[in-house]
Regions:
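Hydrophobic alpha-helical transmembrane segments
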Residues: 1-6, 29-35, 56-61, 86-103
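Hydrophobic alpha-helical segments and helix pairs
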Residues: 1-40
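Structural signature of hydrophobic alpha-helical transmembrane segments
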Residues: 1-7, 48-62, 111-122
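C-terminal ends of transmembrane helices
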Residues: 8-23, 65-83, 127-137
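Hydrophobic, aromatic-enriched interface-forming segments
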Residues: 30-74
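Helix-coil boundary and interhelical linker segments in multi-pass alpha-helical membrane proteins
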Residues: 39-52, 102-114, 161-165
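Hydrophobic alpha-helical membrane segments
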Residues: 94-98, 115-130
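Final/C-terminal transmembrane alpha-helix of multipass membrane proteins
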Residues: 142-163
Length: 165
């Protein structure tokens, strides 16, 4: 069911005159929506994420989404092969960071909602950052905005947790 909806949404966003059009913003929106749904599904079950194996599978899914987004950006903007390879390596490093971050979240006494938001915000920011990197490199303003959003949301979410031993 969910796979069918994902494919239907992808085709609805990308098909124009029976040709798959290159649409960067819509592809980014699709990737973020899929990250949101996957994160909700992953963190909904309290027993789902405590193991390293399951968090690595989540990281592999993040890599698949980020790598496909980077590949679509590379094809759309006709980037050199070396930059495409570098972007793919950046997607892999981002996926490993997300997997480690997710695994670390299970070490903290957080609710499923807090874990989900602490997963989703950095994951969406990393995908957005990869898109800006493919567009010629992020500006200082963009780096500052991404870092501010991450740190601000981290502080707000961790401040809202009832820390009881």
């Amino acid at each position: 069911g969910a796979v069918f909806v994902g494919v239907a949404l992808f085709l609805t966003l990308g098909v124009k005159d029976l040709i798959l059009a290159k649409r960067d913003e819509r592809y980014l929106a699709l990737v973020v929506i899929l990250l949101f749904g996957t994160g909700m599904w992953f963190f909904a079950d309290a027993d789902a994420g405590g193991s390293l194996f399951q968090t690595l599978i989540l990281g592999a899914f993040f890599f698949a989404l980020a790598a496909s987004y980077v590949r679509a950006l590379g094809e759309n903007r006709e980037l050199p092969a070396e930059l495409r390879l570098h972007l793919r390596a950046s997607a892999l490093v981002s996926a490993l960071l997300i997997a480690e971050w997710t695994w670390a979240l299970f070490l903290l006494p957080l609710s499923e909602a807090h874990r989900f938001m602490l997963f989703f915000i950095p994951a969406a920011l990393l995908v957005s950052f990869l898109g800006e990197y493919a567009a010629g490199g992020p500006s200082r303003r963009s780096v500052l905005a991404h870092a501010s959003i991450f740190i601000g949301s981290l502080v707000l979410l961790l401040a809202s947790v009832e820390w009881g031993m």
